């Protein structure tokens, strides 16, 4: 037991030293600098395993004001078999966020990917409607009042701006969007409800134009869409904001090579668009990135801040 006690003490000492080195090195906080300009948050994506890494957690706690669950709130994680829900990973992240004063963006309720086969196999309209409503209601009820915003539907457009083929669009047509948003609004009226997508980098691109066109139509029909989430730059961000939503956010930012200028341009784009409320980078360290080979994040594989990190701080 004495040996074990010494081992635990040593681990704790190393963790505290690591955290201390990180905090000493990072005199500024991106979140504090960003929110000083009137924005709501500068956040990151994470999950339980990453938050249990001491170096990663120290950076999250020090530098970021918002968390998006990378995988733990997706359908295959929360409802892998019909009616049997698992909230262990999502609970951990939400509890951590509450304890450390971080906002949470729920990600994601309706997505064609990471979808259990039992959902993909549904071909009956009434069955899918019931399943969709039950899933959204169960997940959102658990975290009611604890989530700043939800990505209600995710990546539903093709590159030409048409609706993507999925079990939802095949069986329900575009009405699945109405069903999803109306259900979400009824469960948690205080949460901001988002439609989220990628490759919305140009105002003239077909996908961007399709997003704006559909959102305008859905808003006119009374569908309660509050925001559009994207990884984008100024021209497209302005176009998305003009769709009639009350806010937009940059939700899944990572840039291959982590160009300082590209990162600064994105930050400035959000600062320049009044409706842009926040930025979320998709991870902390290149070590844990889903595309680590392209070194896309603000911290390298040794948890050291990169040039892009320092450039953002300087720009703010």
From Swiss-Prot:
User: Which InterPro entries does this entry report, sorted A to Z?
Assistant: GH10, GH10_dom, Glycoside_hydrolase_SF
Molecular function per GO = endo-1,4-beta-xylanase activity
- Active site, UniProt feature: 155, 252
What Gene Ontology cellular-component terms does the record carry? extracellular region
What UniProt keywords are attached to this protein's entry?
A: Carbohydrate metabolism, Disulfide bond, Glycosidase, Hydrolase, Polysaccharide degradation, Secreted, Signal, Xylan degradation
SMART domains this protein is in? Answer: Glyco_10 (SM00633)
Q: What is its main location?
A: secreted
- Induction of expression: Expressed in presence of xylan and repressed by glucose.
What name goes with this protein? Probable endo-1,4-beta-xylanase C
Q: Give the species this sequence originates from.
A: Aspergillus fumigatus (strain CBS 144.89 / FGSC A1163 / CEA10)
């Amino acid at each position: 037991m004495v040996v074990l006690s010494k081992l635990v003490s040593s681990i704790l000492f190393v963790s505290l030293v690591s955290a201390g080195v990180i905090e000493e090195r990072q005199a500024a906080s991106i979140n504090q600098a960003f929110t000083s300009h009137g924005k709501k948050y500068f956040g990151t994506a994470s999950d339980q395993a990453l938050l249990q890494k001491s170096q990663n957690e120290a950076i999250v706690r020090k530098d970021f004001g918002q968390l998006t669950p990378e995988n733990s709130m997706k359908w295959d994680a929360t409802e892998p078999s019909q009616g049997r829900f698992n909230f262990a990973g999502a609970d951990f992240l939400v509890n951590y966020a509450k304890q450390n004063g971080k906002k949470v963006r729920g990600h994601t309720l309706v997505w064609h990917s990471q979808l259990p086969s039992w959902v993909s196999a549904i071909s009956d309209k009434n069955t899918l409607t019931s399943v969709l409503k039950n899933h959204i209601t169960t997940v959102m009820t658990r975290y009611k009042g604890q989530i700043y915003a939800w990505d209600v539907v995710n990546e539903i457009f093709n590159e030409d701006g048409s609706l993507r083929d999925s079990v939802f669009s095949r069986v329900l047509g575009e009405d699945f969007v109405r069903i999803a948003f109306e259900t979400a609004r009824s469960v948690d009226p205080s949460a901001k409800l988002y439609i989220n997508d990628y490759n919305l980098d140009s105002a003239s691109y077909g996908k961007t134009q399709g997003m704006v066109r559909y959102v305008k139509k859905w808003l006119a029909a009374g569908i309660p869409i509050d925001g559009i989430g994207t990884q984008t730059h100024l021209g497209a961000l302005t176009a998305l904001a003009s769709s009639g939503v009350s806010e937009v956010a940059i939700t899944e930012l990572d840039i291959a090579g982590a160009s300082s200028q590209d990162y600064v341009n994105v930050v400035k784009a959000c600062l320049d668009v009044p409706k842009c409320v926040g930025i979320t980078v998709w991870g902390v360290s290149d070590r844990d990135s889903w595309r680590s080979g392209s070194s896309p994040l603000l911290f390298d594989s040794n948890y050291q801040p990169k040039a892009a990190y320092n450039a953002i701080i300087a720009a703010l």
